[in-house]
């Protein structure tokens, strides 16, 4: 422990002298109030401290005391369904302890409840050899999540004691005799520094798709479990709704939602909606698998930087248990702005648009902690972290540094488009500018698993949309009637794909989520219409006759998005109906 004195205060940056025994990344208690801060720069005996609380009223001469520990999170039972701030203070218990709706400064509250008792069930017995990552036992944390208590990193040896029963997170529940003869006493909780990634046995190639229930994502721009995706877009384009939809319906075990510098009412929406929503995979409330980290725009700027690391560290902990985790960061632009502010106050050389020169490496550090891994431990298990980051470029300009540095790292780009949003086409993901580098892997995985020709259907549908884009210029100049019959059909089918398939209502109880079998059935119907109508045109039928003769079935295809999942056979039955009606047009002599 080292004690120094404040010499200058500049917003969230405090400079203290007499800190020669301190280290970079040490946590400090700043001033008489004991505000939480982290050392981010050392120059001789002077330390620059990033303070995670409001610094007004703090002045030169006040003491600074280091703890000798880096910024760490507590990992154990009690994380799920909880809401933390950027440095893992539990907001509901904070409010009860301080009897205030605001964050009172200098209040220290443990992240995990020290009074709550958890029923621990051992999985190993005394005398067994254990290594780091082995699962010692389980705690049923929620109806959905079984919390697996693991041997901490760098601990191994012989299990000499393990107890069943109800314990708090600080009670000793097991003892391990290590190779040097010392006894390690372990509890249900462990701590981990947030800026250090948790070790794994092996990184694996992600191949299994993350099913989100959003048709434009799952069909054209899929992300894998263990992948990384970016959602850039201007204000009002629907970034937050896309993130909420994925958090609600993604086929993962755990969701960690980090509200980083965005509006407080967006976190309020999450708190209001999530407890009422039922997870289609488990039948339980979605809050039973969710951890919320709220660091809204009216909270201290410096804590935004910590909130992203806090979220990804909690995600790594659940990944190490063998779970698939999705982490949503909304938005990484606000996090980058916090980096820019601290860099400016440190008087560092600025890079593009005032952001620090190390912006790219910091963004890479975050996204590279995602992935599919084989975890530590003698038991074989895999875990995944899927990282999805919203980016809010000013004015929707994706050439700005945060977006460009993000695109260098992630493999999926869901580009939200202001003109689409203005036309009320949601999700406003532009199918011409977005991309997914996982498309081939996911397509072959689905073809193999479902024994279907999915990747071919996706390619055909995208080709129709691209053909429509190339014809639009001609239509604007000389009108739709000047096109050939085949091109008019292409325009009609493209409109069907856009309006009846890609457009999706997040606030409709049925349309908000579409399972993969339903997506395939809907797309098959549209492509069957295109194929059969093309054949009819080649046999001499007129385009207008085909459209009039199939008006009823096309209307049913358009309404199929509102057919519940349990009535899937109704959608599949439309394929034969399409063929039948087009043959009927030919038989009537629509030539």
Swiss-Prot record:
Specify whether Translocase is a keyword of the entry.
yes
GO cellular component labels: proton-transporting ATP synthase complex
Q: Does the keyword Hydrolase apply?
A: no
Give the residues the record marks as binding ATP.
233-240
Q: Which CDD domains match?
A: ATP-synt_V_A-type_alpha_C, ATP-synt_V_A-type_alpha_N, V_A-ATPase_A
InterPro entries according to UniProt? ATP-synt_VA_C, ATP-synth_a_Xtn, ATP_synth_asu-like_sf, ATPase_a/bsu_AS, ATPase_F1/V1/A1_a/bsu_N, ATPase_F1/V1/A1_a/bsu_N_sf, ATPase_F1/V1/A1_a/bsu_nucl-bd, ATPase_F1/V1_b/a_C
Q: Which UniProt keywords apply?
A: ATP synthesis, ATP-binding, Hydrogen ion transport, Ion transport, Nucleotide-binding, Translocase, Transport
NCBIfam families, per the entry: PRK04192.1
Identification of the protein by name: V-type ATP synthase alpha chain
Native species: Streptococcus pyogenes serotype M18 (strain MGAS8232)
Q: Which gene encodes it?
A: atpA
């Amino acid at each position: 422990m080292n004690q120094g004195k404040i010499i200058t205060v500049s917003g969230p940056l405090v400079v203290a002298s007499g800190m020669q025994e301190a280290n970079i990344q040490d946590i400090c208690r700043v001033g008489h109030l004991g505000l939480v801060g982290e050392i981010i720069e050392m120059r001789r005996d002077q330390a620059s401290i990033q303070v995670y609380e409001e610094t007004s009223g703090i002045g030169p001469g006040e003491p600074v005391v280091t703890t000798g520990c880096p910024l760490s999170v507590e990992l154990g039972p009690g994380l799920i369904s909880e809401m933390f701030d950027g440095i893992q203070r539990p907001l509901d218990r904070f409010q009860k302890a301080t009897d205030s709706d605001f964050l009172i400064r200098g209040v220290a509250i443990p992240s995990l409840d020290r009074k709550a008792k958890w029923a621990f069930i051992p999985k190993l017995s005394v005398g067994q050899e254990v290594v780091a990552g082995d699962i010692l036992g389980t705690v049923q944390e929620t109806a959905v999540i079984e919390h697996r208590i693991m041997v901490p990193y760098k601990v191994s040896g012989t299990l000499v004691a393990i107890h069943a029963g109800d314990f708090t997170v600080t009670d000793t529940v097991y003892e391990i005799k290590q190779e040097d003869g010392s006894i390690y006493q372990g509890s249900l909780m462990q701590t981990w520094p947030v800026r250090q990634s948790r070790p794994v046995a092996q990184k694996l190639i992600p191949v299994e798709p993350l099913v989100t229930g959003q048709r434009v994502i799952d069909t054209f721009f899929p992300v894998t479990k263990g992948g990384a995706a970016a959602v850039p877009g201007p204000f009002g384009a629907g970034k937050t709704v896309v993130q909420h939809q994925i958090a609600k319906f993604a086929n993962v075990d755990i969701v960690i939602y980090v509200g980083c510098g965005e509006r407080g009412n967006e976190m309020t929406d999450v708190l209001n909606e999530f407890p009422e929503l039922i997870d289609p995979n488990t039948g339980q409330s979605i809050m039973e698998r969710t951890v919320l980290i709220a660091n809204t725009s009216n909270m201290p700027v410096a804590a935004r930087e910590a909130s992203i690391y806090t979220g990804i560290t909690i995600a790594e902990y659940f990944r190490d248990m063998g779970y698939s985790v999705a982490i949503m960061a909304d938005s990484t632009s606000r996090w980058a702005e916090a980096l820019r502010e601290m860099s400016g106050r440190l008087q560092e050389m600025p890079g593009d648009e005032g952001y620090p020169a190390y912006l790219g490496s910091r963004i890479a550090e975050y996204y590279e902690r995602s992935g599919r891994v084989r975890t530590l431990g003698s038991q074989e298990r895999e875990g995944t972290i899927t990282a999805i980051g919203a980016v809010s470029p000013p004015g929707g300009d994706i050439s700005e540094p945060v977006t460009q540095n993000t695109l260098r790292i992630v493999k999926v780009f869901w580009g939200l488009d202001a003109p689409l949003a203005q036309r009320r086409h949601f999700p406003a993901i532009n199918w011409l500018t977005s991309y997914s580098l996982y498309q081939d892997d996911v397509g072959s995985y689905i073809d193999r698993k479902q024994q279907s020709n999915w990747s071919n259907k996706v390619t055909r549908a995208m080709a129709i949309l691209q053909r429509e884009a190339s014809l639009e210029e001609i239509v604007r100049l000389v009108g739709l009637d000047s096109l050939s019959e085949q091109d008019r059909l292409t325009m009609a089918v493209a409109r069907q794909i856009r309006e009846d398939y890609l457009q999706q209502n997040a606030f409709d109880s049925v349309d908000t989520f579409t399972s993969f079998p339903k997506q395939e059935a809907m797309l098959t119907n549209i492509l069957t219409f295109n194929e059969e109508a093309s054949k009819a045109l080649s046999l001499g039928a007129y385009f207008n006759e085909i459209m009039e003769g199939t008006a009823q079935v096309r209307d049913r295809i358009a309404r199929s998005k509102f057919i519940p999942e349990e009535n899937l056979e109704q959608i599949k039955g439309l394929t034969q109906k399409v063929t039948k009606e087009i043959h009927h047009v030919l038989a009537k002599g629509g030539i």
